[in-house]
Amino acid sequence: MSNLTLSQFLQQEKGNLTPELAQVIDTIAATCKTIDQALQKGALAGILGSAGNENVQGETQKKLDVISNDYLIDALKVHPHVGGLASEELDDFTPAQENGEYLVLFDPLDGSSNIDINMCVGTIFSILPAKNAVTQAQDFMQAGTQQVAAGYVLYGPSTMMALTVGNGVAFFTLDPETQTFLLTTENVQVSADTQEFAINASNQRHWEQPVKQYIEELLAGKTSVREKDFNMRWVACMVGDVHRILCRGGIFLYPYDLKDPKKAGRLRLMYEANPMSMLIEQAGGASTTGRVRILEIEPTELHQRVPVIIGSKNEVERVTSYH
């Protein structure tokens, strides 16, 4: 069986997918191949470890955070159909081309704390329509429902892309010989029920009561009202956890906690929560803060953080009902 290339797949898609949008997605995919090659060199190229500074989030940047960010900025800021860029790693947005039809937001290397131990990392991206001929910061303040495409590239045992353009979710696998993304799964679906959950349990003492109650029920398994056992998984890379959910169901929680009351959550709305929520919802799952649907949040700042509860629909709805 011959697999469609990513470019061929994009040519066949309908709906929101214009030829211009297809070109932007192709450029993101090509840049992620370059990131993949840098990751594979690792210690051989002297690019592991800290870059010696912090990003706007107050997180210590890894060398590959900076390298991946630079690759994406350099490739997209000259793209004729990109009006502006926003990165988790940079304080402000980056202007691109006048009259560019799209805005691209990204987390260049999600889970970068995994780099030095050779575990999975990924690139997350979100594409919004541009609002003006010359992009302004306010143009990025669009709810997730306005996304025209979203996806991620997972750098794991094989390199894979998950993509939605508003018409379901598809998986592509990078052929290492031809360096081509090939379609390997169409119409990805998240099961409504699950017996797997992902959460950083070390924060339990900081959680709100609804989340504590929910997790206590899961841990009690058959002896609780749930009457079945659950397994816990935690990759420390949202791309890895969401990919597992898209493949076999599950629920991922990074809930609101009281560790730092100034932060409503830990994950970034524009670079992580929105694109992952679009993917999960397009695959039949659900996504919420525990109180509101993530895709309906009207952002007020570029680096806004939100709680995230995402995955199999029946479990997400159960957590929401506890709030």
UniProtKB/Swiss-Prot annotation:
One of its GO terms (molecular function) is magnesium ion binding. Binds 2 magnesium ions per subunit. The keyword Hydrolase applies. The keyword Cytoplasm applies. Pathway: Carbohydrate biosynthesis; gluconeogenesis. Its EC number is 3.1.3.11. GO terms for biological process: fructose 1,6-bisphosphate metabolic process; fructose 6-phosphate metabolic process; fructose metabolic process; gluconeogenesis; sucrose biosynthetic process. Keywords: Carbohydrate metabolism, Cytoplasm, Hydrolase, Magnesium, Metal-binding. Signal peptide: none annotated. Its cofactor is Mg(2+). Substrate binds at D110, G111, S112, S113, N200. It comes from the Bacteria. InterPro entries: FBPase_C_dom, FBPase_class-1, FBPase_N, FBPtase. It is found in: Cytoplasm. Mg(2+) 1 binds at E88, D107, L109. Mg(2+) 2 binds at D107, D110, E272. Gene3D superfamilies: 3.40.190.80, Fructose-1,6-Bisphosphatase, subunit A, domain 1. It catalyses: beta-D-fructose 1,6-bisphosphate + H2O = beta-D-fructose 6-phosphate + phosphate. One of its GO terms (cellular component) is cytosol. Homotetramer. Belongs to the FBPase class 1 family. HAMAP family: FBPase_class1. This is Fructose-1,6-bisphosphatase class 1. It comes from Acinetobacter baumannii (strain SDF).
